[in-house]
Curated annotation (Swiss-Prot):
GO terms for molecular function: polygalacturonase inhibitor activity. One of its GO terms (cellular component) is plasmodesma. The gene is PGIP1. InterPro entries: Leu-rich_rpt (IPR001611), LRR_dom_sf (IPR032675), LRR_N_plant-typ (IPR013210), PGIP (IPR051848). It comes from the Eukaryota. Belongs to the polygalacturonase-inhibiting protein family. Residues 1-21 form the signal peptide. It is a peripheral membrane protein. Keywords: Cell wall, Disulfide bond, Glycoprotein, Leucine-rich repeat, Membrane, Repeat, Secreted, Signal. LRR repeats lie at residues 69-93, 94-117, 118-142, 143-166, 167-189, 191-215, 217-237, 238-260, 261-285, 287-309. Glycans are attached at N106, N130, N238, N291. It comes from Arabidopsis thaliana (Mouse-ear cress). Disulfide bonds join C25-C55, C56-C63, C298-C320, C322-C329. This is Polygalacturonase inhibitor 1.
Amino acid sequence: MDKTATLCLLFLFTFLTTCLSKDLCNQNDKNTLLKIKKSLNNPYHLASWDPQTDCCSWYCLECGDATVNHRVTALTIFSGQISGQIPAEVGDLPYLETLVFRKLSNLTGTIQPTIAKLKNLRMLRLSWTNLTGPIPDFISQLKNLEFLELSFNDLSGSIPSSLSTLPKILALELSRNKLTGSIPESFGSFPGTVPDLRLSHNQLSGPIPKSLGNIDFNRIDLSRNKLQGDASMLFGSNKTTWSIDLSRNMFQFDISKVDIPKTLGILDLNHNGITGNIPVQWTEAPLQFFNVSYNKLCGHIPTGGKLQTFDSYSYFHNKCLCGAPLEICK
């Protein structure tokens, strides 16, 4: 092999070695991540966060491509023996699009205001933790947010009406907390696509705002609260709703003239004070789950469609409901 070829091979080897050993991770991001690790008491769950290695290879992280200079775009800490509060340094990851702290029973404190700095955030999941305090109003500043999940925490107080101003929100999941007060009137006027709305297992009270009847939810779950009054505005044959769960509240309205969406696959109204007869129109829906037990319904269960495919547990404990799968009407 001549001298020129040898030099070319040596250059190529040096070039490849340099490229392979070069960190993709931004140094500012790496420094921030190491501060986050320290703030969380250096948990074993983050053992891969070694300052001598490329942080884009660390567990719980994702980096973007060259168009964003390989900045950290996702921080997902799921399970593990993590203790402490949400580190303030989280707000110093400016390219973050996904932030998840989930199934961390020793994560305490409030939802930190530093999160408001994450203007590129599209997904925020803080769930199955011991976070306390209110849902902060500053979340409405995250104008790129598409998915918000704050379920299975100990959050309290009222739901900020400002959440309805999020222009790109597709799902609001606030279930299983200790939220009180009423559902905001503003939730009847989201600026963009109507989001899936899940507010179950809280202590919400009062009537449903009439404004909610103006929009077409795909999924709405208000179950296991203290809501009362009329909920008929959520229905309508012209809507495209797939799932409605109003179970275990104190709703009182007559369903006799309530048409349901012809797209409805899930309907749960159990444990309320709903009256009237089940309309024949309900046989037109492609129901996969159906429960109207523990109400004050009367009359004959309409035949046809899906209504007879459900067993008696979907109908029992009503005032005078009859027909298959219950006893024959007399």
